[in-house]
Amino acid sequence: PAARPMLPPPDYDLAAEVQKHDVLLSYPYQSIRPFIAMLKKAAHDPEVISIKMTLYRMARESQIVQALMEAAENGKEVVALVELRARFDEQNNIDWSKQLESAGCTVIYGFDDYKVHSKLTLITKKSKEGYSYITQIGTGNYNEKTSELYTDYSFITADHGIGEEASNVFQNLAVQKLTEESDRMLVAPLRFKSVLLEEMDRVIAAAHMGRPASIILKNNSISDRDIILKLQEASCAGVRIDMIVRGICCVRAGVPGKTENLHIRSLVGRYLEHGRIYSFFDGAHTRIYIASGDFLTRNTECRVEVGVRVEDPVLVRKLTDILQLQLRDNVNAREMRPDGSYQKVKPAEGEALVNGQMGMYELLKNDWTQPEPWRLSAAVQEKQPEPSAEAAKPEPAKTEAAPAAKQAEASHPESAAAPESGDRFDQLEQMVNHKKRTEPQPAPAAKPIKPVVVETPAPRSRLKRILDFFKLRR
């Protein structure tokens, strides 16, 4: 079916919205246009004094870069860190860096020994009340084209503390210095892996105390030895671990005595899964991060990556629902066996089909307007009183949940107990499942078969075959 990024209402103003609460955009299900509009507005806002951005991959016709050049031409300080070693985009980045410099932007070319792979934007405003910030931290590139093909997450906030941390990161990048201290932000190589290992230790300690601890990790690849060993330790401690890993995976799931509580799946669908979400549940609270970096050693130790801990309960709810949806996927998913092979996930008899990617459109369809389902859910959860003795009476028996749903709920007890979550996923299954398996479908009308004439290619010389081979290799 046709799928297009969902657009906000015509009067939607991201810069104004972020002053009310943090915002999370999910590409390609939601359009990148609000972010571009925010940059263009900042380029002409008299209160904006500077825009700083890290650029790794850009579109060949980039509205984002055009907005930066407009800002510089309007007298604002524009700092762009362009990574010239982005594989396959070297020439494109060189061309854009020249145009940025010509427009009056300050262009930084990063470190000699570290690639700057982070996705970070900082808009600084000065008014009568003082300085204020709008900070954007993402998992994907500032590329309008790939934002319609890759699944990524973009966190935008006006939190002053995060703005100060982002400003510190840019100051360090300007003098080729690594960031050593941060609170809510993850900044590799010094404040990325160490923070995530601390989060895992917190969950392991909760498991030793008998709490229902769990970890959910979604990224592209994992090879870092320290993280793998910590995951094994968590599994042996009884922590339920669910991993969604699209690419390289150097840890095996379900190995008795080592990773028997670790479950790994890969999602390959219409869009390239590119987002990174790291969720840690200690039996009482969820601490969740999004980041630009995977768990490859090159990301954790050899690159400048940036992530952030999301604290807005609405966005924590939203990210948790996204993870749960992907753990319920039985259309695009393949699960790892203990021998390292993968087996396609097939729905059980009578179980509804759940396509995690197409289901995102239903999950986010009302996200631009108020009240958001997650904001309403969080408000109900905060105001809900303690259950009384009468309220604790057993409810009528319900139809037993499908196996995939049980597994997803077990991986994160907090999300399973949250109000409205089950109803929303029940509706989601009905919307995503376009055709019920039990309903007979009429056979499509047969089309007449046309004869196809296949021409026999002329014989090629050995030299011609070699040249054609190298053309294909390109």
Where do the language-model regions lie?
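N-terminal localization/anchoring segments of enzymes in phospholipid and broader phosphate metabolism
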Residues: P1-I215, D224, E233, A237, ...
